[in-house]
Amino acid sequence: MAKTIKITQTRSAIGRLPKHKATLLGLGLRRIGHTVEREDTPAVRGMVNAVSFMVKVEE
């Protein structure tokens, strides 16, 4: 089974760049405190890196 990471949204998307809002939706995050589990791939890591100030990552 592929390694997964837990991603939790910690800050609001209100007033953010449209690109950042789209990245959050691409990760499946909809609201503050929402947690999703995603495969640990370079694509997902890149998305997390783009909005790192708005999310928390657990290995």
From Swiss-Prot:
Gene3D superfamilies: Ribosomal protein L30, ferredoxin-like fold domain. GO terms for biological process: translation. It holds the Pfam family Ribosomal_L30. One of its GO terms (molecular function) is structural constituent of ribosome. Keywords: Ribonucleoprotein, Ribosomal protein. The keyword Ribonucleoprotein applies. GO terms for cellular component: cytosolic large ribosomal subunit. NCBIfam families: rpmD_bact (TIGR01308). Belongs to the universal ribosomal protein uL30 family. Part of the 50S ribosomal subunit. This is Large ribosomal subunit protein uL30.
